[in-house]
């Protein structure tokens, strides 16, 4: 188990147990995804929570103000506990681990689909069918991303499998093939 998981797993497992005992798992998972999105998209938030300059009470007050009406009371307690224990800077890792454990418990495969441009519903539906056959399960959580550097096509990551059907990937493979010939 990686060192970071040694720190994050106990928090994630305990919080999932609390959520299960209160029948809040689905709600908590949705909230965890929202907070992770905020953490990853707002460097001011993650920097403030990771800052050694801000005192614990200031961080807890900020968390209370930001999330008291957005999350369950048990989720707010987790946030405050992480602040008290000087672990709030690891919030993203704790929440990512929580989502991993949630998926493991429910046998949900995470598929990340990165495309060169946004996919319409028909494209998403068609791609979903193919990803389900690759993953060997209908129980999938799809994470759609857009990366214009792919130039065209898409890249699918499911577990340890990677399917690169992007133009950038084809160009890279062509370059490698030409390098072998020369």
UniProtKB/Swiss-Prot annotation:
<dbReference type="InterPro" id="IPR026015">
    <property type="entry name" value="ATP_synth_OSCP/delta_N_sf"/>
</dbReference>
<keyword id="KW-0793">Thylakoid</keyword>
<keyword id="KW-0813">Transport</keyword>
<comment type="function">
    <text>F(1)F(0) ATP synthase produces ATP from ADP in the presence of a proton or sodium gradient. F-type ATPases consist of two structural domains, F(1) containing the extramembraneous catalytic core and F(0) containing the membrane proton channel, linked together by a central stalk and a peripheral stalk. During catalysis, ATP synthesis in the catalytic domain of F(1) is coupled via a rotary mechanism of the central stalk subunits to proton translocation.</text>
</comment>
<dbReference type="InterPro" id="IPR000711">
    <property type="entry name" value="ATPase_OSCP/dsu"/>
</dbReference>
<comment type="function">
    <text>This protein is part of the stalk that links CF(0) to CF(1). It either transmits conformational changes from CF(0) to CF(1) or is implicated in proton conduction.</text>
</comment>
<dbReference type="GO" id="GO:0046933">
    <property type="term" value="F:proton-transporting ATP synthase activity, rotational mechanism"/>
</dbReference>
<dbReference type="Pfam" id="PF00213">
    <property type="entry name" value="OSCP"/>
</dbReference>
<comment type="similarity">
    <text>Belongs to the ATPase delta chain family.</text>
</comment>
<keyword id="KW-0472">Membrane</keyword>
<dbReference type="InterPro" id="IPR020781">
    <property type="entry name" value="ATPase_OSCP/d_CS"/>
</dbReference>
<dbReference type="GO" id="GO:0031676">
    <property type="term" value="C:plasma membrane-derived thylakoid membrane"/>
</dbReference>
<comment type="subunit">
    <text>F-type ATPases have 2 components, F(1) - the catalytic core - and F(0) - the membrane proton channel. F(1) has five subunits: alpha(3), beta(3), gamma(1), delta(1), epsilon(1). CF(0) has four main subunits: a(1), b(1), b'(1) and c(10-14). The alpha and beta chains form an alternating ring which encloses part of the gamma chain. F(1) is attached to F(0) by a central stalk formed by the gamma and epsilon chains, while a peripheral stalk is formed by the delta, b and b' chains.</text>
</comment>
<dbReference type="GO" id="GO:0045259">
    <property type="term" value="C:proton-transporting ATP synthase complex"/>
</dbReference>
<keyword id="KW-0375">Hydrogen ion transport</keyword>
<keyword id="KW-0406">Ion transport</keyword>
<protein>
    <recommendedName>
        <fullName>ATP synthase subunit delta</fullName>
    </recommendedName>
</protein>
<keyword id="KW-0139">CF(1)</keyword>
<keyword id="KW-0066">ATP synthesis</keyword>
């Amino acid at each position: 188990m990686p060192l970071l998981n040694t720190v994050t797993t106990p928090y994630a497992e305990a919080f999932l147990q609390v959520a299960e005992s209160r029948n809040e798992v689905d709600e908590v998972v949705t909230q965890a995804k929202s907070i992770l999105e905020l953490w990853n998209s707002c460097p001011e938030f993650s920097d403030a929570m990771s800052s050694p300059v801000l005192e614990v009470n200031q961080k807890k007050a900020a968390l209370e103000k930001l999330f008291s009406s957005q999350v369950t009371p048990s989720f707010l307690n987790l946030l405050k506990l992480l602040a008290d224990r000087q672990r709030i800077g690891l919030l993203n890792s704790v929440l990512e681990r929580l989502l991993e454990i949630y998926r493991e418990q429910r046998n949900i495969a995470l598929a990340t689909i990165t495309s060169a441009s946004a996919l319409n519903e028909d494209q998403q539906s068609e791609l979903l069918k193919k990803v389900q056959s690759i993953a060997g399960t209908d129980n999938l959580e799809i994470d759609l991303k857009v990366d214009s550097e792919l130039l065209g096509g898409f890249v699918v990551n499911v577990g340890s499998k990677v399917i690169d059907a992007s133009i950038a990937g084809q160009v890279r493979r062509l370059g490698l093939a030409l390098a072998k010939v020369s």
